[in-house]
Amino acid sequence: MGLPWYRVHTVVLNDPGRLLSVHIMHTALVSGWAGSMALYELAVFDPSDPVLDPMWRQGMFVIPFMTRLGINNSWGGWSITGGTITNPGIWSYEGVAGAHIVFSGLCFLAAIWHWVYWDLEIFCDERTGKPSLDLPKIFGIHLFLSGVACFGFGAFHVTGLYGPGIWVSDPYGLTGKVQSVNPAWGAEGFDPFVPGGIASHHIAAGTLGILAGLFHLSVRPPQRLYKGLRMGNIETVLSSSIAAVFFAAFVVAGTMWYGSATTPIELFGPTRYQWDQGYFQQEIYRRVGAGLAENLSLSEAWSKIPEKLAFYDYIGNNPAKGGLFRAGSMDNGDGIAVGWLGHPIFRDKEGHELFVRRMPTFFETFPVVLVDGDGIVRADVPFRRAESKYSVEQVGVTVEFYGGELNGVSYSDPATVKKYARRAQLGEIFELDRATLKSDGVFRSSPRGWFTFGHATFALLFFFGHIWHGARTLFRDVFAGIDPDLDAQVEFGAFQKLGDPTTRRQVV
């Protein structure tokens, strides 16, 4: 045929059987990738420390999606929440991966069958004897079936009526587990952080899809609308399908990057805005304040802070800190977190408590500045020693740790104080193992960042694809060079000069 690479899909343009075949093969490839990727991730995943080395620190991409849909256990005898299990059941991580691979194989065989047996009676128009598809009817069928699936997911899987439920957590990502969810039918259902909205929206959207599908199966489109929207052209289907996909991709890029109930921080890592707003820092200080109000000592109050909460309050877990071309997991960057050293409190020789200014997201380096409770600069690590007024040595800064591994330990040596002041810029201080993975010390992004970047990029590409194919189908006659007045131009006697529309004969 000699088609250029960008025109190869024309071979299925008027061939319904093989059009179906290539779509089944595409499903086989997607499902096969998902199952294979899951098995690869399970082979390299270390479930031993769900607090300091969770899936998102290890760069897992498909395991979080399985987990949020209710998968908890592995045939390896471990659970994602920690501990061991004896009976994981068939729907473990490996079971789901295997089901995808088996499904992929069946789709592969079905694709081959439909490629070989392409000329089926079902695709033949009785009136013309040529292959054709009733596209409005097919649209109704697909809408009805997707509505059933959507309703079933919301009414059964998410609610736990027939299924495991979904991953639900608290606002600080500490108590997450798989549980059933009741639909939220009030205004709270529109809050993106309320899990009940997932159930109610799927039930509502599924019901709408079922009704819309039945409508399109029972009502034919008006002729003018059919022709105006080119409903008989398969490229119209392509264009509108691309529109649905790019719209969904833009939406999920947003829910992933800004956070929602569908993207829990325990599975995908925290968002950059939680660092920017001091979200976890405020909660930590609130808990410490509550402990002090109960007459606990400062050391006891800080020791009650969960290590998991302290770990979220570390800039290395900010997905916006990873560079665009820094491949690999977060653990390959700053290392595997081993333990929390504790919260450092700095004081000058006059007894003022000092706070280290934290590094903003988009800085790679940042001056070390210590301020008091009123925001007045009291100490710093100067760039030029000759002009310094507030150096650690001059001000006499000391540091004492509360909670964590260094609880009760204090340092007055200026070099050590400056070391911990630099590290306090990055949030809570953790001991990091860089040797095991040969980590290079340069921050990486989490799966939250990769997912957002990938979906936003492909959404933009697919947007242009929608415009391209929509224009092709709407203006097909123009691009093909077929003029609506062509018949008149070649009709004998229509013009005084053949083909010249300015010399049209007047009908008497």
UniProtKB/Swiss-Prot annotation:
Keyword Membrane in annotation: yes
Entry GO terms, CC: chloroplast thylakoid membrane; photosystem II
Transmembrane segments: 21-36, 101-115, 140-156, 203-218, 237-252, 457-472
GO molecular function, one term: electron transporter, transferring electrons within the cyclic electron transport pathway of photosynthesis activity
UniProt xrefs under Gene3D superfamilies: Photosystem II CP47 reaction center protein
Membrane topology: Multi-pass membrane protein
Compartment(s): Plastid, Chloroplast thylakoid membrane
Thylakoid in keyword set: yes
Any GO BP: photosynthetic electron transport in photosystem II
InterPro entries recorded: PS_antenna-like, PS_II_antenna-like_sf, PSII_PsbB
Keywords attached to this entry: Chlorophyll, Chloroplast, Chromophore, Membrane, Photosynthesis, Photosystem II, Plastid, Thylakoid, Transmembrane, Transmembrane helix
Family: Belongs to the PsbB/PsbC family. PsbB subfamily.
Quaternary structure (record): PSII is composed of 1 copy each of membrane proteins PsbA, PsbB, PsbC, PsbD, PsbE, PsbF, PsbH, PsbI, PsbJ, PsbK, PsbL, PsbM, PsbT, PsbX, PsbY, PsbZ, Psb30/Ycf12, at least 3 peripheral proteins of the oxygen-evolving complex and a large number of cofactors. It forms dimeric complexes.
Protein purpose: One of the components of the core complex of photosystem II (PSII). It binds chlorophyll and helps catalyze the primary light-induced photochemical processes of PSII. PSII is a light-driven water:plastoquinone oxidoreductase, using light energy to abstract electrons from H(2)O, generating O(2) and a proton gradient subsequently used for ATP formation.
The protein, known as: Photosystem II CP47 reaction center protein
Gene name of the encoded protein: psbB
